[in-house]
Amino acid sequence: MPGLNLTRDEAIERASIIKRVHSYHIFLDLRTDQDVFTANVEIRFDAQEGASTFIDAITSSVKSINLNGEELSTDLADGERIQLPNLAAENVLKIEAEMFYTNTGEGLHRFVDPADGEIYLYSQFEVPDSRRVFPVFEQPDLKATFEFEVRVPSHWVVVSNQPEVKIEEKECGCGRANTWYFKPTPRMSSYITAIVAGPYEKITSELTNSEGRVIPLGVYARKSLMPFVDAEDMFELTRQGFEFYEEQFKTPYPFEKYDQLFVPEFNAGAMENAGCVTYLETYVFRSKVAEALRERRAITVLHELAHMWFGDLVTMKWWNDLWLNESFAEFMSTLAAAENTRYAKEAWATFSASEKTWAYRQDQLSSTHPIVAEIRDLADVQVNFDGITYAKGASVLRQMVAWVGQENFMAALKVYFDKHSWGNTVLDDLLVELERTSGRDVRAWSAKWLETAGVNTLAVEVENDEAGNISSLGIRQSYAEGFETLRPHRAVIGFYNLVDGKLTRTDRIELDIDGELTVVEEALGKKRPDLLLLNDEDLAYAKIRLDERSIETAIKHLGDIDSSVARGVVWGSLWDTVRDAQMPARKYVDLVLNNIGKETNSTALRTQINNLSATLHSFVAPEAREETRHRAADRLWELACVAEPDSDAQLQLLQAFINQTRTEEQYDNVQRLFEGELTLEGLDIDADLRWNLVCRLATGGRFSAEQIAEELENDNTANGQQYAAQAYASIPTAEAKAEYWNKIMVTGELSNMIQRYAIAGFKSGKPELIAQYNEPYFEQIEGIWRSRSHEISMQIIGGMYPSEPTAELLERTEAYLASLPEDAAALYRQIAEARDGVARALKVQAADI
């Protein structure tokens, strides 16, 4: 894997030689066998005469290389790059090659549908994987037009960035085939080009944009999955997104069509290929899902649409400005949801519960980095698709918009798009427009917010007189060791009082916070409320420390706060105090169990269940862990039983109970649910919930391999195969664990998605069953990192890291990190993040008294 790297210095040097890439004409023959396919490419580009460079191409074999009419030796190709000597001022390069299909979700992924045996293909190119499909100058600033010609079996469809211009049917050596010809694209980076091919089915619609242009819309999925696709919901969200973005940006949608395709075994949530967006199939709901997942799908739809402007129309020059793509798309998607969709009421509460929780966690790891990160090479950027680039960046943008004003912000974006359409930008290109429209010193703001790392803590310091009126109120700002930056914050202080059983806001103060101590003069003389909520409305990006009186009010009445955003701020503040070892873990467990039954925001409920699980596994003192887990599972069962029938809460609480099942009595309830002897009103044991029960019963030794095989026979679908892998790997026997250790760590035979589920199964159950694999993990992981693809190795590095946070594991991990060579920086980062988790867990365990 490291041999496939490209450094920033190499990219800069190549861009100085390649003056302009004009066009690619790419022919792909996708009728070939399951291992390789044919790719022929013609590239026209200008270069420094007499210079030499290289083109990226991860190939099975190279048949021919022709540069300006001269046949070059195929020895110039090493399977990763093709050297190009003695360039002319104007060049025509023709290459014929065979490329590999993958089962890792990188390059051109090949999937066989178990339901009907049909073959489906899709491309995934970000960051550096268009080179797995055709020879290409794989860096974002070498833009060009791309014209695709694709030959496929006659019953397939092909979708790309542009509309097809014709389809030719021919009788070929291996049967009838169709060749699809597509219009050339506008100038774009290679990583947002796309090819999706197979017997996909589609549903079509259209919209008329702000220019009066009719934009064709399409939603695609596998034949066996299409009955579950909610195309109307996708179209509704797409129309709402188009309307909002074109109005805000004053810039029309830049492409000719907008297709959205659900593709199998996709690694990410989605990918913003220009006019041809791909999504993971988890967003097709064949069973009932939490409303949190429906809202996540909506945010993802809006996120990818925002990328058509941020990233596709205007692209970062190099990957250090990846945030110009991702932070903006993340922020704009929530803003669009809040202002122009049915998710308006809950959008920012969801953002608080999901994105900001992710950001705060990532920003407190040793691997944290500025939003504008230092990216030395591709290995750096591949591990920087993280909570800083996405979630912190979006959080900070929200802070910026509150500071400069939304109208000024959007006006700056219009000029930015006008100036840089189809080009590449750096940070300063945006800052100059923001300063012009707002009159603010945005560069100084950027230096503190975008170019430094770490999260500040804002703590309330309040006193009142004998009458209960506030006599002093200050906000004290601090920073973590090693991150000595105090930042400006725009924030709201909410005054909440109990009114008719609800904690209701009765007053608010909006202010700028800066420096070590900000005195809030406006609060003096006001009645001290039951809850003084700093960062109400969640504008600021900071850890929040409430005063003791407010903490006690929150613990007793968290579920009674009538604002979902305010509840989210309180949930987040209390979670931070646990993670920082300032609240005993068992007290937090009680807090969650006493309040989640009243939580109405689906994503907040999901987040608190996840935090509860992490606390039970890692933060509760070891001597109290089993008893606390038993008690928590019992309480989750009680909450599920009394939840409103057929409600989101009922489903989430039941799934939480299933995942926390420990005792024989608890397993009995799971067994009876599976067998239909026990029912909850309004609850249907549908396909996915049935598999949840199967996986847990397998973990408890109550479901055999033979029974799993029977379940798979009844649900031999992509979903069924994934769940079956998890169930098999969950069986609590040495033989089952050894079998899946071998499949994951040794043979590498599993596809990306099957491996993901298998890892979850392998790690389930009693930790002593897999403790024997702790040392082999450290012995094998560097070899896996060096030999497997990025996506596969990242799954294994994080997923197979030893489970139990102990002092021995911390010591072993530190020793391993010290032994790693300098060229293993990306591996070091992933292991160091796992180490950070162990160190934090031990600190929190020690405080759980």
Listing of model-derived features with the role each one plays in the protein:
Residues 1-38, 114-120, 140, 443-447:
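N-terminal, polar/Ser/Thr-rich
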Residues 3, 15, 98-206, 374, ...:
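Extended, low-hydrophobicity, Ser/Thr/Pro/Gly-biased non-transmembrane segments
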Residues 23-50, 460-466, 475:
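Extracellular ectodomain segments of secreted/surface proteins
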Residues 42-59, 138, 147-153, 474-494:
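Surface-exposed beta-strand/loop patches in extracellular or lumenal glycoproteins
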Residues 57-114, 135-138, 172-179, 516-527:
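A surface-exposed beta-strand-loop module
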Residues 61-67, 442-443, 453-534:
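Beta-strand-rich binding/interaction modules
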Residues 182, 211-214, 218-482, 614-615, ...:
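Hydrophobic alpha-helical and helix-loop surface patches within well-folded domains
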Residues 387, 467-470, 483-485, 498-505, ...:
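Long, ordered, helix-rich scaffold segments
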